[in-house]
Amino acid sequence: MSDLPWLTIIVILPISAGSSIPLFPHRGNNIIRWYTLGICLLEFLLMTYTFRYHFHFDDPLIQLEEDYDWIDLIDLHWRLGIDGLSIGPISLTSFVTTLATLAAWPVTRNPRLFYFLMLAMYSGQVGLFASRDILLFFLMWELELIPVYLLISMWGGKRRLYSATKFILYTAGGSIFISMGASSMGLYGFDGPTLDFEILANKYYPVVLEIVFYLGFFIAHAIKLPILPLHTWLPDTHGEAHYSTCMLLAGIPLKMGGYGLIRINMELLPHAHSLFSPWLVIVGAVQIIYAALTSLSQRNLKRRIAYSSVSHMGFVIVGIGSMADTSLNGAILQMISHGLIGAALFFLAGTSYDGIRTLFLDGIGGMAIPMSKISTMFSSFSMASLALPGMSGFVAESMVLLGIITSRKYSLTFQIVIAAIMAIGMILTPIHLLSMLRRMFYGYKFLNVLNPYLKDSGPREIFISICLFLPVIGTGTYPDLVLSLWDKKVEAIMFRSFHE
């Protein structure tokens, strides 16, 4: 069984299974829901089996490689493979998508298209993290965009068309830079065109050309992550999307930007990355404070959480730019941690809306008593988001901070200034999160209003919240459980960055 194309099966299963959804009867909403959930569970089990029995975690090299000719005219190969850097995002994608499918249970309008788009998005995301061909990477990047656009524009709020259009303009604009960079890198050189990541990683470019390549890919990944000032699509998108779509957006697409920065900008273009890394650190540190302050001024609950996400991504940017093993490990852990915590917060914001029919904090108050379960879960994940010790966010942010302080690349003055800015950001995060909790769950406004929609969490909501909370606690108490997945790969990347 080890000879089976496991990665190909994992990549194509969701979209191929989703293609059969239109064959289901029009009134078979429950059948469609259970079928989609079953496909997600099957995918998760296949992924778990493959990683458990066919992947060696102490090997930093690419494993489970598959290479098939696809389009000879442009030398495009179906080339897949994974290493420690891929395994975390793929596992996160599978886990969050399965729970988002369960979270989407109340969706009744055109569920066949809704669940097909979720499965198509699933394939695109897993395919991107498993790609070993830069053009295939671009195609998977594009495959993920259209489902997200349709999910926002068809199942969003009142301003869904504006938000969906803004999302597609930003991300499609970034895709242009990826396509240009991928084709240019593939065609450069005297030994013939190649799109293989492994070969591209060993190519050497003139300094100016490498900087041009780096900036092109950086713009695309900066939009996705997002990085200031290319972040404005994110609050609008989260503010209008259905909460199951928000779970997917918070859990995975943002991580595609961080993954791309490491996989392409850092691994394929190390010299340019070394030149730009101080600017990454500065921008990341500023982003932590700016987004935290902006979050504090938001009246809409989902927009406040969205800006909090932008602030947390600042730690990822600092970690990638720090040029230190500890910080890069922390940045990857922060992506995984935020994928879980962010998905949970948006899910709970959505379930709160189902009960109170408003997202504006000015009209919310006193929810702690009538909605005690939601209050408990929301408070728990908010503590995780503000990096409470014992939870995954604390470990990730502490590693990034420690890494920048001990980095060999920067002067002591630079390290102290950046560490001080990050520390201020870590103080601002509890301020805007605790302020949000105070306004939502305490006070008197809501208690004096008779609301026929008022309801607390049911078994489904509690189950999803517990499933997301357990890995947050597990990673916070025993971080080596996940750090061991990619620490060897991080060592290899940093060794190459300092010795080439």
UniProtKB/Swiss-Prot annotation:
- A GO BP annotation: electron transport coupled proton transport
Q: From the record, give the transmembrane residue ranges.
A: 4-24, 31-51, 87-107, 111-131, 134-154, 167-187, 207-227, 242-262, 274-294, 305-325, 330-350, 358-378, 386-406, 416-436, 462-482
Stored InterPro entries: NADH_Q_OxRdtase_chain4, NADH_Q_OxRdtase_chainM/4, NADH_UbQ_OxRdtase, ND/Mrp_TM
User: Which top class of enzyme applies to this chain?
Assistant: translocase
What are the UniProt keywords, alphabetically?
Chloroplast, Membrane, NAD, NADP, Plastid, Plastoquinone, Quinone, Thylakoid, Translocase, Transmembrane, Transmembrane helix
Spell out the reaction equation it catalyses. Answer: a plastoquinone + NADH + (n+1) H(+)(in) = a plastoquinol + NAD(+) + n H(+)(out); a plastoquinone + NADPH + (n+1) H(+)(in) = a plastoquinol + NADP(+) + n H(+)(out)
Q: Which residues form a coiled coil?
A: none
Instruction: Pull one GO CC term from this UniProt entry.
Output: chloroplast thylakoid membrane
Q: What is its EC number?
A: 7.1.1.-
> A Gene Ontology MF term for this entry?
NADH dehydrogenase (ubiquinone) activity
Please classify the protein's predominant subcellular localization into one broad category: plastid
Q: Which domain of life is it from?
A: Eukaryota
Q: What membrane topology does the annotation report for this chain?
A: Multi-pass membrane protein
Instruction: Tell me the disulfide pairings in this chain.
Output: none
Location within or outside the cell: Plastid, Chloroplast thylakoid membrane
Q: According to its UniProt record, which protein family does this protein belong to? A: Belongs to the complex I subunit 4 family.
Q: What HAMAP family does UniProt report for this protein, alphabetically?
A: NDH1_NuoM
**What protein does this entry describe?**
NAD(P)H-quinone oxidoreductase chain 4, chloroplastic
Q: Tell me which species this is from.
A: Cycas taitungensis
